């Protein structure tokens, strides 16, 4: 019998709607008395997740979700279901046992949740876990507005989003083959919940450098690279398009700039030195080659961002993007299209720190760094150079021509039957400012604590762990 993932998602959503995390706090943890310590939300996150899963599995007996998480709770939160404990005190008791558990046990519980949510958008539990969680798609709006009011998860699935999902695998393969050029373990990660706060969640598109232990749990070592993949649907064109043809005939930055400028809203925004960029595009440049000559409409910068953007731009404008141009060779006998690198060069394009994608990137790097710190043998002596880094990858494809639609597109020995033809990859490194990231995290944790207090009258601590993050991000003095 086929598993009905849509129905599972619907059933999970109904459970969460019945019992939000706020109602859970009021109803299940109202007897919590731990005056010796603060009530920490990361333990509440684990309690609440356990509660939701137990309730779901009891009500819908034909499906058992996250068995490994439940089993690990039973095995490692020692005898937390005590027959002498009143039912009304059950989850308060679980909370206390979690708080007294070893850091390794707590870390593993968050890692098991990551494993249980792999597949991301195809996994019902991934969708459920993102509720009552500050994800990369929400962080910008929350930080700018200083409020959760009206903040909703983006669930629009238009052509651009669907094309992006469809092409994630081939974009990752292109990165592996033509940019990283190293052995690559390719597993889709689930939701990485910040183990320190339990508030933030990051879903990584692609990565390099993460390993997996014998239990298939992630191990975050030195120099992990995070790739945020963006499919630029607005540039999906026919091969005979004038600007596509020119780029393929003469793959240079001049041809690339003409191609970029051929769209009414160019994907790389030109800004003069010292001028504030708009928030429209996530890549900007100081190179006049990308100047469209059109006057940009002025857009006020949020007051709480102006100072930081003037600091973040100089940090990032030193970066250059790597441009890789692709074409294919057609074999009529084998009915194949073999993708190859036609040209590679760098361009003066860098991340726009005013854009929401910059905020997505810093959250992903922060959460991954928390796992790195907790996995490190000696976290007090972490080298800044070994922290996770982030790249944003802009992928542009062209449409298949009629005589290409039934061909097998090949990258190395892997076939792609439905994907369009790769044309451009722009790989842009992002410079993270730990001070700014720490302030964003701390501010949002405070907003989160205030929201819980308003909803429940409970004083909950959302531990940000920014001290450890700042310490890890600071350059260590050289020994004489």
Curated annotation (Swiss-Prot):
Write down the EC number: 3.1.-.-
Q: Does the keyword Nucleus apply?
A: no
SUPFAM superfamilies, A to Z = Restriction endonuclease-like
Localization, UniProt: Host nucleus; Host cytoplasm
- Can you name one GO molecular function term for this protein? endonuclease activity
Can you name a GO cellular component term? host cell cytoplasm
Do the record's keywords include Nuclease?
A: yes
Q: Per the similarity annotation, which family is this?
A: Belongs to the herpesviridae alkaline nuclease family.
Task: Please identify the protein, giving its name as recorded.
Answer: Alkaline nuclease
User: Origin organism of this chain?
Assistant: Human herpesvirus 7 (strain JI)
Source species taxonomy: Viruses, Duplodnaviria, Heunggongvirae, Peploviricota, Herviviricetes
Gene assigned in the entry:
U70
